[in-house]
């Protein structure tokens, strides 16, 4: 049975269990791009497109017969459940696992440290992937305490959950138990300009149109205001025109012990970013802290430069007196990042085999180039 046939069988099954699927939805498969949902007729604004009842959802509450489930996190339990269903046909939902991706070679979590792309990824992306790898390894060890499962199969199940889970109020006091998998819901792909809204209540999961959808349009959901770094590390894809680009500047900004102590004391240590909307407030505070000289005077709230930073932090000043110095400093930082990004983009192109993970890696560096160039021509505040 083809993947499209598996999806069609899954859609028929959820409808037989009480789900509402609008007749104008067409569940399709795009070659080399995966599944999607298309409109086979015009759809009006504020139309219910999908409504899933709780009896077809997959979470700790609906899969309660396993005695060890409460000894695992929902993520660990669902990862095992999905991977186990492949071998033993537990039928958590007929056709559900059959319609899942057969593999995740496109997902960067599967990259190894000797992969030629690994060392050319942006540092913050590589660190995020290492963190995800460590979480997956920890989850595998926890699951092995109760059941036997081989690592490749568990990794497949873990990535299925990682790329498909959503938050659904199960009624549990433990919010971690709200992690849920929803058959056919996952076929709505992500776009920051989605034509739909998700309505998530304890009774149902509902998707409604927020504008008119024309026949032939792909129907999207918005997973959140995520930049490509997040989309790549979590879901394994990037958008070529993502309005939510954010670049990390931490490794380009150095602080001495006085500056670090001041920023830690006031809750502004680390996580310095810029986006197409400008520099984050944290970043502007961090740079203003760097401008205080000598830095030992950061301990003296009456010192003029320190007082100005504190007034800026507390909203008593717009920081205009130091704005030009802040912009000059940030432009130097962005120039350094721009040079690195241009060099690394060319390195990725030079070793690319044309596969999707290389396309995404190049896009990550393109994001940085575009953001740096834009900000260097505009105000940061």
From Swiss-Prot:
Its main location: cytoplasm. PANTHER family: ACTIN-HISTIDINE N-METHYLTRANSFERASE, UNCHARACTERIZED PUTATIVE METHYLTRANSFERASE. SMART domains: SET. Keywords: Cytoplasm, Meiosis, Methyltransferase, Nucleus, S-adenosyl-L-methionine, Transferase. Belongs to the class V-like SAM-binding methyltransferase superfamily. RKM2 family. The keyword S-adenosyl-L-methionine applies. It comes from Schizosaccharomyces pombe (strain 972 / ATCC 24843) (Fission yeast). Residues 23-224 form the SET domain. Gene3D superfamilies: set domain protein methyltransferase, domain 1. The keyword Transferase applies. Its EC number is 2.1.1.-. GO terms for cellular component: cytosol; nucleolus; nucleus. One of its GO terms (biological process) is methylation. It is found in: Cytoplasm; Nucleus, Nucleolus. InterPro entries: SET_dom, SET_dom_sf, SET_MeTrfase, SETD3_SETD6_MTase. This is Ribosomal lysine N-methyltransferase set11. The gene is set11. S-adenosyl-L-methionine-dependent protein-lysine N-methyltransferase that trimethylates 60S ribosomal protein L12 (rpl1201 and rpl1202) at 'Lys-4' and may dimethylate L12 also at 'Lys-40' and 'Lys-41'. Overexpression causes a severe growth defect. Has a role in meiosis. One of its GO terms (molecular function) is transcription coactivator activity. S-adenosyl-L-methionine binds at residue 223.
């Amino acid at each position: 049975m083809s993947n499209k046939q598996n999806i069609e069988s899954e859609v028929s099954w959820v409808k037989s269990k009480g789900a509402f699927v609008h007749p104008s939805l067409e569940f399709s498969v795009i070659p080399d791009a995966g599944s999607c949902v298309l409109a086979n007729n015009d759809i009006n604004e504020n139309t219910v497109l999908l409504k899933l009842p709780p009896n077809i959802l997959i979470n700790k509450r609906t899969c309660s017969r396993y005695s060890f489930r409460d000894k695992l996190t929902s993520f660990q339990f669902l990862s095992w459940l999905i991977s186990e269903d492949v071998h033993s046909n537990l039928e958590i939902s007929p056709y559900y696992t059959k319609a899942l991706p057969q593999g995740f070679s496109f997902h960067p979590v599967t990259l190894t440290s000797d992969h030629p792309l690994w060392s050319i990824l942006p540092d913050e992306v590589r660190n995020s992937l290492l963190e995800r790898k460590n979480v997956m390894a920890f989850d595998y060890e926890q699951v092995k305490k109760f059941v036997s499962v081989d690592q490749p199969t568990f990794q497949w199940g873990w990535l299925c959950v990682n790329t498909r889970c959503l938050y659904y109020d199960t009624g549990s006091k433990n919010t971690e138990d709200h992690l849920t998998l929803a058959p056919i819901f996952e076929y709505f792909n992500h776009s920051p300009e989605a034509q739909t809204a998700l309505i998530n209540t304890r009774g149902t999961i509902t998707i409604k149109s927020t504008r008119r959808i024309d026949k032939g349009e792909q129907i999207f959901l918005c997973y959140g205001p995520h930049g490509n770094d997040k989309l790549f590390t979590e879901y394994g894809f990037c958008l070529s025109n993502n309005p939510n680009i954010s670049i990390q500047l931490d490794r380009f900004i150095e602080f001495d012990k006085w500056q670090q102590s001041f920023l830690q004391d006031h809750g502004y240590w680390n996580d310095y970013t810029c986006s197409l909307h400008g520099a984050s407030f944290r970043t502007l505070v961090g740079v203003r802290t760097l401008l205080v000289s000598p830095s030992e005077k950061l301990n003296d709230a009456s010192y003029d430069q320190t007082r100005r930073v504190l007034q800026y932090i507390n909203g008593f000043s717009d920081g205009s007196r130091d704005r030009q110095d802040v912009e000059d400093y940030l432009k130097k930082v962005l120039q350094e990042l721009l040079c690195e990004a241009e060099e690394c983009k060319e390195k990725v192109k030079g070793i690319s085999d044309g596969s999707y993970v290389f396309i995404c890696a190049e896009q990550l560096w393109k994001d940085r180039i575009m953001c740096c160039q834009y900000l260097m021509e505009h105000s940061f505040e």
